Amino acid sequence: MARRAAAGLLRRHLGPLAAGETLQARGMYPKQYGAANHAFSRFYSIQGQQRSLYGFRTNVETDDTQQSARMNFEVQKRSFSSAAAHVQRNPAYSVLNSDDVSYFKSILGDSGVVQDEDRVSVANMDWMGKYKGSSQLLLLPKSTAEVSKILSYCNSRRLAVVPQGGNTGLVGGSVPVYDEVIISLGGMDKIITFDNVNGILTCEAGCVLENLSSYVENKGFIMPLDLGAKGSCHIGGNISTNAGGLRFIRYGSLHGSVLGLEVVLADGTVLDMLTTLRKDNTGYDLKHLFIGSEGSLGIVTKIAILTPAKLPSTNVAFLSCNDYISCQKLLLAARRSLGEILSAFEFMDRHCINLAMKYLEGVHNPLPVSPYNFYVLIETTGSDESYDKAKLEAFLLRSMEDGLVADGVIAQDISQASNFWRIREGISEASVKVGAVYKYDLSIPVEKLYDIVEEMRSRVGDMGQVLGYGHLGDGNLHLNILSTKYSDKMLAQIEPFVYEWTSKQRGSISAEHGLGLMKADKIHYSKSSEAVQLMTSIKKLLDPNSILNPYKVLPQSVL
């Protein structure tokens, strides 16, 4: 009873404990910021970068592939890694001509066929300005039937294509490498049905994740995934990359949430797997081939996905730890103490916080007293406000008294909670403002997860700054190396070391971002030769002309 009486006198800042001091002695307990405020927005908008508009030719009949390839090679070489130097344009692909454009206009209309240099230029480049293709054509289908006709024609002509959603990826998977035709799914953004009893959403692939989140939340449900880029990314792209995100610790991967898919194969065949059944044991579950295949086996056009119930009680805490071992122990304690209400466990090192404070507008450091080494963001969601609050209070009390938490802040309103999430979600945005950023998305056993950050700092020295952050709850490290410019010298210190080190830990070189172009020829660090060969066989079976998102996912040497 004394604890609950003291709860009315809560302070926002917990403050570090003195030797032998307890939180009970201070009368400090966390504050829950209210069921009514559950649906606060975590989305942050990324200011559009000033991209140079490369002047592409409008005469699509001229075969200037070599010039295009040279231009593309130079951009890739300066941008991200040595991998692009080994990718040559497949000479088996046809070159776009005026007859092709005329055909596409016959099925899409003039508005669905974009040749404007400025618009195509934007679609040719990723949001970080690191990956750039030289496509001269952007197609905007509005139905599965139109996607089918496009692919059937491109397959017969052997025109390579790249499917594109919100273009928020980090590994060059959603932009052309050379002159591939870009197929944007943005016009396919309809919500088809929603089952209010079972929480099953059926929609088209071009739906923006944030729009879907708003829709299902109004129905009393939430999307099973949440990403910093949810205001731009498409659900089709999320599924094609098997995006993980911030709710993975609670709801798992999309392999468990996606119930059905509609996919258009390379030859235009529409594969209808759009079931909404929770159980279906009739033969092979083919949808799993396309979840995470990055558009290399087929283009996802419709999705049926299970959405969890929206829970009324939400708490967000921003904590500091003195060392990484404390972060590990805090995670274990959170799993044991918070159990079923734990919905996010994110960690950041102090370099991330410093970067966020410097480059993100409108944020402030929740713990400005001392420069701690590590920070942890914990979110809980549950159905009983008083029960959830009591569990979080007890957990934080024990964690501070055990020395796992050095300091902490509990969000008391939407603004504070949004600020906490803005810091975590804005790290990627802030990192690109430094100049050059080498991004690695690794899955590593939690006890060894931060070791590679420290080793990378030793290797890089004063050439750059190394950041470590990510989803500690599922062993996903985002390793960022920042520098003022890209250089071969820096790259030599990073690769192949980062892949070799991860492989020795039996980790994955791609936890959630996919392989794309960046890591297609690095797949052997995470997969056996037998597994890669089987993947190659599947690719050749479903896409024998290899027109779907070429140069991505699998090494060119095996195709």
UniProtKB/Swiss-Prot annotation:
Q: Which GO terms describe its cellular component?
A: mitochondrion
Q: Which cofactor does this sequence's record say it needs?
A: FAD
The Gene Ontology biological process terms listed for this entry are: alternative respiration; photorespiration
Q: Is Transferase there in the keyword field?
A: no
Q: How is the cofactor bound?
A: Binds 1 FAD per monomer.
- InterPro entries under this entry? FAD-bd_oxidored_4_C (IPR004113), FAD-bd_PCMH (IPR016166), FAD-bd_PCMH-like_sf (IPR036318), FAD-bd_PCMH_sub1 (IPR016167), FAD-bd_PCMH_sub2 (IPR016169), FAD-linked_Oxase-like_C (IPR016164), FAD-oxidored/transferase_4 (IPR051264), Oxid_FAD_bind_N (IPR006094)
Where can this protein be found? Mitochondrion
Q: Where is the transit peptide?
A: 1-80
A GO molecular function for this record? Answer: FAD binding
**Signal peptide location in the record?**
none
Q: Which reaction does it catalyse?
A: (R)-2-hydroxyglutarate + A = 2-oxoglutarate + AH2
- Keyword annotations: FAD, Flavoprotein, Mitochondrion, Oxidoreductase, Transit peptide
The FAD-binding PCMH-type domain is annotated at 131-310
Q: Which family does it belong to?
A: Belongs to the FAD-binding oxidoreductase/transferase type 4 family.
User: What does the annotation say about its assembly with partners?
Assistant: Homodimer.
Name of protein: Probable D-2-hydroxyglutarate dehydrogenase, mitochondrial
